[in-house]
Amino acid sequence: MKIRTGCDVEQISRFEGLLKKAHFCQRAFTDAEWEHIENSGHPEATAAGIFCAKEAMAKALGRGLFGLLPKELGVEWDECGAPYPVLTGSAAEQYGQVQLAVSISHSGDTAFATCVALEE
């Protein structure tokens, strides 16, 4: 059994400009994530947290974003609002057998996420 962790931290204010770039948003966020960002009331913080989660997942998988699209490392939310990872495309093909858990947090102008990966 292998256990890996990944984490990432982002400056929330950086996403004020990034969210205005359609190309970035289309490549980085799924439709469900974009809907969550738009409905959050704090779009920059929400987007930064989601992006941190994607980076944390990529690191926990042991490769970073090399060869993966950020959009393939998805984040969805359960009925209590807790985030959980959803892999699609080549990420699902390569890592569908790996169990992932993700957590996202914010403080001031900082978003942080951590991911734990368990591979049997």
Predicted features and spans:
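Core catalytic alpha/beta fold that binds nucleotide/phospho-ligands
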Residues: M1-E120
